[in-house]
């Protein structure tokens, strides 16, 4: 499985919480225009939209910021994923990651568990579970 996407997020809260748990909630939307699923029957090409990602960014560290995230969305593919099921699937995921902050831009690295399932749209619904390493490049915009 391989994918490329873009994310836009909004910080929802001011920092709060005690000690090392101090952080803030972020809501994000992912658009994944390139989603490849390599299967025994061939490669399925798809598009993903994840309108729900809720993330807790820890705010105590300054240059390396850990986070965890829960999210979900929809995956549309040109072939059945898994084979014999559906062209439309739903995704749910959880991730642990780090933002490496610089003055203007940042890098991110995360480990993500993702479940892909058609939620009963087809009579066959075996689902796929994946563990992914994701790398990202971005910019945090600050509003004043």
Question: Residues of each region from the PLM?
Answer:
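Transmembrane beta-strands of outer-membrane beta-barrel pores
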Residues: 31-37, 72-78, 100, 113-117, ...
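Glycine- and aromatic-enriched membrane insertion/assembly motifs of diderm outer-membrane
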Residues: 1-51
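Short loop/turn motifs that connect adjacent beta-strands in outer-membrane beta-barrel proteins
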Residues: 12-25, 59-65, 101-107, 142-144
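Membrane-embedded beta-strands of outer-membrane beta-barrel proteins
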Residues: 6, 52-54, 68, 94-96, ...
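Extracellular loop and loop/strand-boundary signature of outer-membrane beta-barrel proteins
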Residues: 39-41, 78-84, 119-125
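Outer-membrane beta-barrel "beta-signal"
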Residues: 128-144
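Transmembrane beta-strands of outer-membrane beta-barrel proteins
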Residues: 23-31, 66-72, 107-111, 131-135
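Residues that define the transmembrane beta-barrel architecture of outer-membrane proteins
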Residues: 1-4, 43-50, 64, 86-92, ...
């Amino acid at each position: 499985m391989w994918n490329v996407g873009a994310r836009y997020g909004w910080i929802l809260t001011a920092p709060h919480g005690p000690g090392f748990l101090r952080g803030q909630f972020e809501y994000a939307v992912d658009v994944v225009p390139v989603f490849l699923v390599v299967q025994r029957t061939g490669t399925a090409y798809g598009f993903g939209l994840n309108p729900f990602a809720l993330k807790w960014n820890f705010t105590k560290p300054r240059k390396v910021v850990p986070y965890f995230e829960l999210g979900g969305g929809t995956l549309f593919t040109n072939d059945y994923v898994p084979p014999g099921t559906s062209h439309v699937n739903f995704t749910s995921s959880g991730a642990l990651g780090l933002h490496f902050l610089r003055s203007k831009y940042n890098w991110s690295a995360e480990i993500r568990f993702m479940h892909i399932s058609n939620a009963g749209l087809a009579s066959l619904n075996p689902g796929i579970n994946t563990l992914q390493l994701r790398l990202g490049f971005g910019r945090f915009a600050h509003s004043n």
